[in-house]
Design a protein with these regions (language model features):
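Activation segment signature within eukaryotic-like protein kinase domains
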Residues: 134-135
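Activation segment/activation loop of eukaryotic-type protein kinase catalytic domains
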Residues: 162-213
Length: 360
């Protein structure tokens, strides 16, 4: 006779002691759950501050565990960068329980509104300028290639908007946006110097072997040979930003994929689909149509080495917002987008107010 004992989720956390981690971090409310992790809001009983706790319970593979540990390492290393421009949640702690069967990561709890929620509640109330300001802020926060890291899963559910005003003329821009969930992030540079047993090397060797990120954001190079010379892995996230910009302009998704087969089929005619959809944004963008069409074409290029960097696209959005750059000449748009930072045909009023343009 077989006796089955049913243990529900609440009992599991109580029985394992996961309600209080490290005698400090108390889990209060489950807020998210994905294929490889579960998230909780809680409280740090040492400081009394609200926290976010991410758990990986019985990782299904060494690759999954490596991704989790790599996210913790990346966030821990952001302390200095966040002191200048805050873009990621502040790291508090991470570790493992039960000989690595459960991994945990503790960060601050970010108070704000997910971009996915903002789109549902505010898209049709917001003007195009207000939506482009959101795009500018997100582009600024999403660019991490200066640290040789790409996020690999940028979508509205991983982007938190802070309820604070943004100064477009400050010497040190703060985009008031926090990018969440770095579990898919990768640095090819770090991988090239890593030992085979290092987490970043395990992640690099596993690229393309399993897909756990959103189908919608996958760029055409998802299944390319990651070791081939000249791979522009640093522009992986630019594709996702192109899709987001299109959504912020039109309110629509450029593509709809339910499975990997649909994604693979779409790649056969992706360039024609993009050209057709982008050409029709004029009813949403009006006087800004030409410049926004050009920007979308430069972000949504199938060949990654020809794709625009996020930080350059951010600068283009800044010029549209601050300089009110709305050219009505196709040739001027083409010349401008070939070199936005060096474009000399316009006398800018405020260009030097964007200090990052000098760096990039």
């Amino acid at each position: 006779m077989t006796i089955e004992i049913s243990v529900n989720k609440e009992d599991f956390f109580d029985l394992t002691g996961l309600r209080l981690i490290d005698n400090r971090f108390r889990l209060l409310e489950e807020v998210s759950g994905g294929k490889s992790s579960t998230g909780f809001f809680g409280i740090d009983e040492l400081t009394g501050k609200s926290i976010f706790v991410k758990l990986s319970i019985f990782p299904r593979s060494e690759l999954e565990a490596a991704r989790f540990r790599n996210e913790a390492r990346f966030l821990k290393e952001q302390e200095w960068a966040n002191s200048i421009i805050k873009k990621t949640p502040s790291y508090i702690s991470h570790g493992e329980l039960f000989q690595g069967k459960i991994l945990y990561l503790v960060t601050e709890k970010i108070e704000g509104q997910l971009l996915s929620d903002w789109l549902i509640k505010n898209f049709y109330k917001a003007s195009l300028t207000e939506r482009l300001l959101i795009a500018y802020r997100v582009f600024g926060a999403a660019e991490h290639f200066g640290q040789f890291t790409t996020h690999h899963d940028l979508h509205p559910g991983n982007i938190m908007l802070l309820d604070e005003d943004v100064d477009l003329h400050t010497d040190v821009p703060d985009y008031k946006v926090i990018i969440l969930d770095w579990g898919q992030s990768h640095s090819k540079l770090e991988a090239s110097y890593a030992e085979e047993s290092d987490d970043i090397a395990i992640i690099h060797n596993g690229m393309g072997r399993e897909i756990t990120a959103s189908f919608y954001n996958l760029p055409p190079e998802t299944f390319m040979d990651r070791n081939r010379a000249g791979s522009e892995y640093n522009k992986y996230d630019s594709w996702a930003m192109g899709l987001l910009l299109y959504k912020l302009i039109t309110g629509n998704n450029l593509f709809n994929f339910d499975n990997i087969g649909q994604f693979a089929e779409a790649m056969r005619h992706i360039e024609m689909d993009i050209e057709y959809q982008v050409k029709n944004i004029d009813k949403y963008a009006e006087k800004k149509s030409l410049i926004l069409q050009g920007l979308l074409y430069h972000l949504l290029v199938k060949e990654p080495r020809e794709r625009m960097f996020i930080q350059i696209a951010r600068h283009v959005l800044w010029l549209i917002l601050v300089e009110e750059f709305e050219p009505d000449d196709v040739g001027m748009v083409a010349r401008f987008l070939r070199d936005p930072l060096g474009f000399k045909e316009v006398n800018w009023k405020y260009f030097e107010s964007d200090p990052l343009a000098r760096i990039y």
